[in-house]
């Protein structure tokens, strides 16, 4: 039975949603594109191309954004060091974590932690999450409101 291109595209989208859901659920686990692709019965190249087409970013970029969002929440709590947060969200390298955090948020994690601990007291978590959501593509420095 041959498959139409539209039917194949719908199957790929369903697999991509499962990959995205796995990243959302298991962001703190060691994940790589090869493992995600195996789980979706796709090649790594096909997964990366289709994921980017569907969601506008690579699977790795999406994973790092999820990790940084979670790191921001942990840093706002103020009870963990930057290193502890780095490992809690699944990053193996403090340098990579700090670089990516700074790219997305517009300030280093230590600065964010210091400002957030004092700047969002009494702010509901759901509001803090929206206000402090990472911004992509070097836009953070130009548009990020200060928390303090």
Regions found by a protein language model. Give the residues of each.
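Alpha-helical bundle regulatory/interaction domains
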Residues: 1-46, 53-54, 58, 70-148
């Amino acid at each position: 039975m041959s498959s139409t291109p539209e039917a194949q595209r719908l199957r790929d989208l369903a697999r991509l949603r499962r990959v995205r859901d796995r990243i959302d659920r298991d962001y703190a686990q060691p994940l790589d594109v090869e493992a995600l692709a195996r789980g979706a019965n796709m090649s790594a190249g096909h997964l990366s191309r289709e994921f980017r087409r569907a969601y506008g970013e690579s699977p790795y970029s999406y994973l790092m954004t999820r990790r940084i969002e979670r790191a921001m929440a942990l840093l706002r709590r103020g009870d963990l060091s930057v290193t502890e947060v780095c490992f809690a969200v699944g990053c193996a390298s403090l340098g990579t974590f700090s670089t990516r955090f700074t790219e997305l948020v517009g300030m280093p994690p230590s600065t964010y932690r210091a400002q957030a601990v004092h700047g969002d007291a009494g702010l509901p978590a759901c509001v803090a999450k929206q206000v402090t959501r990472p911004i992509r593509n070097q836009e953070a420095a130009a548009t990020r409101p200060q928390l303090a």
